[in-house]
Amino acid sequence: QILIHQKTELLEAVTGFETCNQYELRNIMGQRIFTAKERSTVCARWCCGSLRPLTLQVCDYSGREVIHFIRPLKCTSCCFPCCLQEMEVQSPPGHTIGYVVQSWHPFVPKYCLLTESREPVLKVVGPCLMSSCCGDVNFQVKPLCESRSVGRISKQWTGLPKEIFTDADNFGIQFPKDLDVKMKAVLIGACFVL
């Protein structure tokens, strides 16, 4: 299991000015194993909000980049299924290992995890309601047939003050037991698309 904690930015909480997000990825015992930093433009953050194009650099404890996420600008809407979200996952940077691609559905958020050759491996299926008052929002990781859940991504409730004054999110990932390390990186990428 991996926990992803988005750092709360004081400037963002006080002024509402959207800054580049930063994250800490921790193991189940709370030890920091990676950090992630967003790279995006001020204009994109202001004009496109959460749909902005961005790159995320995931670095190990020594500061060496180990995973690189690239998300192009896409507009998403249940009315416009032609511009769905997509994220490319590279590890090492410059070498594509997979993709997270949104699948169109009018009511339920669905994403497909693909290999570097764009072959589907797993699906991530969210709830009909994306927000929950005072509770976690769970996304089920399922095989392609969607017959059962093999893992979970949980968008964790962070408390009323943090939920009201910031857009900082915390995620928990429970990986399928026999999942390839490349697909684990792609599943981590899914958290940054949700």
Protein language model regions, located:
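Low-complexity or membrane-interfacial segments used for flexible interactions
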Residues: 1-64, 71-86, 92-96, 102-194
